[in-house]
Amino acid sequence: MDKEKAEVSPEEESAPASAEDLAAQKREARLRKFRELHLKTNEARKLNHQEVVEEDKRQKLPSNWEARKARLEWELKNEEKKRECAANGVDFERAKLLEISAEDAERWERKKKRKNPDLGFSDYAAAQLRQYQRLTKQIKPDMEEYEMEKEKQGELFYPTSDSLYHGTHVPSQSGIDRMVTDLEKQIEKREKYSRRRAYNDDADIDYINERNAKFNKKAERFYGKYTAEIKQNLERGTAV
């Protein structure tokens, strides 16, 4: 029996050892792959959490936040360009025009026309709204005065329900002068468009006052062709 054991070859002795090594290598490979999958899972969970947090932040922002952000960035860039032109002694408006190509200028004009097109007179409310939009676009805020007022008032510049700052602000003389000048321009322009016409004694009187006469003329200009037949029938007495 001892003789048979002594006659076992080295290959037969190394066979179980090599099988155990192979199994250990496979087990190590599986563990390594499991660890890699575990790391990837944790990384994916972390990225998903970050994305959820960012999405929650975006949902809490105002609906027009992206447009407002782009607008603020443009205004900041514009202010920096103004300061740079002022430091170099260059006219800002001229420098800005030099940077705009002919295609961009034409596209901008088309966009402005689409944004506030002149469709003619429809009613007084629409005309008043159009005038309001045009006047508000012409407002040029004085940012230097704004910053000075903010620095002067401190915390009162952002009043709360307990603040007494509201109603105490006194406009500057330059601001009052700008307002008066603008009102005078509006009155002058209005007078050009509302010149008093001479009355025609032979014309039919279908109005009760001057304003009603103007309204009737505008209504006739826009809707006269649709009501001509009705008027003729009424005059002949053949209207149903």
Curated annotation (Swiss-Prot):
Record-level GO BP terms: mRNA splicing, via spliceosome
GO cellular component, as recorded: catalytic step 2 spliceosome; nucleus; post-mRNA release spliceosomal complex; Prp19 complex; U2-type catalytic step 2 spliceosome
Region annotated Disordered, chain positions: 1-25
Coiled coil feature spans: 63-91
Location(s), subcellular: Nucleus
Signal sequence bounds: none
Highest taxon of the lineage: Eukaryota
InterPro entries, per database record: mRNA_splic_SYF2
Keyword S-adenosyl-L-methionine: no
Quaternary structure, from the entry: Identified in the spliceosome C complex.
Family: Belongs to the SYF2 family.
Name assigned to this protein: Pre-mRNA-splicing factor syf2
Source species of the chain: Xenopus laevis
